[in-house]
């Protein structure tokens, strides 16, 4: 009762293809891949130490 047979997976696949169409699925997978790449890039950027930035500014003198 708890496991899904091959026929269940086939029916799910047909429903997904009908809902999204053949062209939409590769587009969605590309978006997922871009998200994973940006997540990995964010994780590696987090590990790099940031250098301290100093801002030199002159105080306004009022008379």
UniProtKB/Swiss-Prot annotation:
Please name the Gene3D superfamilies in this protein's record. Answer: 1.20.5.3310
Compositionally biased spans, kind Basic and acidic residues: 53-63
Q: What is this protein called?
A: Sec-independent protein translocase protein TatA
PANTHER family the record matches: SEC-INDEPENDENT PROTEIN TRANSLOCASE PROTEIN TATA
Q: Name one GO biological process term.
A: protein transport by the Tat complex
Task: Tell me the membrane topology, using the record's own terms.
Answer: Single-pass membrane protein
The transmembrane segments are 1-21
InterPro entries the record matches: TatA/B/E, TatA/E
């Amino acid at each position: 009762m708890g496991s899904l047979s091959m026929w269940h997976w086939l029916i799910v696949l047909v429903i997904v293809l009908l809902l999204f169409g053949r062209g939409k699925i590769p587009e969605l997978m590309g978006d997922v891949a871009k998200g994973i790449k940006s997540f990995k890039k964010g994780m590696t950027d987090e590990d790099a130490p940031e250098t301290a930035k100093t801002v030199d500014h002159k105080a306004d003198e009022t008379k």
